[in-house]
């Protein structure tokens, strides 16, 4: 029986084989590089956006509840809120302020240009009270007053980025041919929906968009000292009694953050799954390379076996070699993926998309490298197993 090779000898053989065919090795790992690059950049940006949204939601305050007329995000509401539901919520013990209104999208005109923005309308004093600690701060001008009619507050992006000429406080914009004077401009919030927005008084908004007496969002603040979870459950009971079903969502800031994060998480996993196809292509490339390498080195295998190397030693040499190919591809892909994520973050921030952030952690780095190594090992295992079983006498004869 032969003597087993040392671990460092196995690693040396594997490295030597890779170095001897550098060009072939580089071509082999391209698929792994592309797959890891795509996965790292997408995971980094996906979790970066989730973390940003979670932080922003938590800034809303631990005493705020958001109520939406649908059970799941992205599903059209089967019915809308009315004054009946508003009254039912106001009567719930522990409720302090109830702010209600409508959000949607519309076209606005300024200086002959037309652009699409998101719009919100609500009672101005209630809006200020509910969102006073949530980053909705005035950069220039003032907030809307309850008696303002054809006046508006616009988002940072609407004022500074959308039009060729910046909108100033006092300028006039048009919505559905109605003129509105800009009385205030919000500070930059970091997401396009809020930054590219316009806020109107509820009295004007209802008539302008034809939604009188109907509302697609309600925000509630809970009195100090009250249990927000208990108040949330009481609101659910009141709405169920009013609606007759449970086709609505009552979410605290933490629940809202978790819900949005879970939706984004599913999207991230799907996109990463698509990117993983490149890794599969890379794995096939490594497998083919190892198969060709074994055919080319039949005599080397025969010599090693004749010198006493065991079948497990030959298997280990080729498995380690394929594992290192996967690892090298993973390292290159990881570095390029991080750089790509950082570049996208910088460009997004320059364009005003502050929610786009690159999230890099040691868990991601170590996980990607281990995964890449395992992909290489698995890809090379079956060709290596067939090579390890070769008969040394036949290989030395060149058969």
Curated annotation (Swiss-Prot):
GO terms for molecular function: transmembrane transporter activity. GO terms for cellular component: plasma membrane. It holds the Pfam family FtsX. It comes from the Archaea. It is a multi-pass membrane protein. It is found in: Cell membrane. The keyword Ubl conjugation does not apply. The chain crosses the membrane at residues 26-46, 266-286, 301-321, 324-344, 358-378. The keyword Transport applies. InterPro entries: ABC3_permease_C (IPR003838), MacB_PCD (IPR025857), Macrolide_Exporter_MacB (IPR050250). Its main location: membrane. Coiled coil: none annotated. Keywords: Cell membrane, Membrane, Transmembrane, Transmembrane helix, Transport. PANTHER family: ABC TRANSPORTER PERMEASE YTRF, MEMBRANE COMPONENT OF TRANSPORTER-RELATED. Belongs to the ABC-4 integral membrane protein family. This is Uncharacterized ABC transporter permease MJ1507. It comes from Methanocaldococcus jannaschii (strain ATCC 43067 / DSM 2661 / JAL-1 / JCM 10045 / NBRC 100440) (Methanococcus jannaschii).
């Amino acid at each position: 029986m032969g003597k087993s090779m040392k671990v460092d000898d196995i690693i040396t053989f594997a490295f030597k084989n890779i170095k001897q065919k550098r060009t072939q090795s580089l071509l082999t790992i391209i698929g792994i590089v592309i797959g890891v690059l795509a996965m790292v950049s997408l995971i980094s940006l996906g979790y970066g956006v989730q973390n940003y949204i979670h932080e922003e939601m938590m800034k809303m305050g631990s005493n705020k509840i958001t109520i939406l007329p649908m059970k799941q995000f992205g599903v059209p509401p089967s019915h809308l809120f009315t004054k009946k539901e508003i009254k039912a919520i106001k009567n719930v013990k522990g409720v302090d302020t109830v702010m209600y209104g409508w959000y949607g999208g519309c076209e606005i005109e300024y200086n002959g240009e037309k652009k699409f923005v998101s719009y919100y309308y609500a009672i101005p004093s209630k809006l200020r009270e509910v969102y006073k600690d949530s980053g909705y701060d005035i950069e220039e001008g003032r907030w809307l007053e309850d008696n303002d009619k054809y006046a508006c507050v616009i988002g940072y992006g609407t004022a500074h980025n959308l039009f060729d000429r910046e909108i100033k406080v006092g300028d006039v914009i048009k919505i559905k041919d109605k003129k509105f004077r800009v009385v205030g401009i919000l500070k930059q919030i970091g997401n396009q929906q809020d930054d590219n927005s316009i806020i109107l008084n509820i009295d004007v908004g209802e008539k302008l968009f034809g939604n009188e007496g109907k509302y697609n969002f309600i925000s509630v603040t809970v009195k100090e000292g009250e249990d927000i979870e208990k108040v949330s459950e009481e609101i659910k009971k009141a709405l169920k009694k009013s609606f007759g079903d449970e086709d609505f969502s009552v979410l605290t800031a933490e629940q809202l953050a978790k819900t949005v994060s879970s939706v984004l998480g599913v999207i991230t996993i799907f996109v990463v799954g698509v990117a993983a196809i490149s890794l599969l292509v890379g794995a096939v490339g490594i497998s083919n390379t190892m198969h060709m390498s074994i055919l080319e080195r039949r005599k080397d295998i025969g010599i090693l076996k004749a010198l006493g190397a065991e079948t497990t030693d030959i298997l280990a040499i080729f498995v380690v070699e394929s594992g290192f190919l996967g690892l090298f591809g993973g390292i290159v892909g990881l570095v390029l993926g991080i750089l790509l994520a950082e570049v996208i973050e910088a460009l997004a921030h320059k364009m005003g998309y502050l929610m786009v952030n690159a999230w890099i952690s040691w868990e991601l780095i170590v996980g990607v490298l281990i995964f890449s190594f395992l992909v290489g090992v698995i890809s090379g295992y079956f060709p290596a197993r067939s090579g390890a079983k070769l008969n040394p006498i036949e290989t030395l004869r060149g058969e």
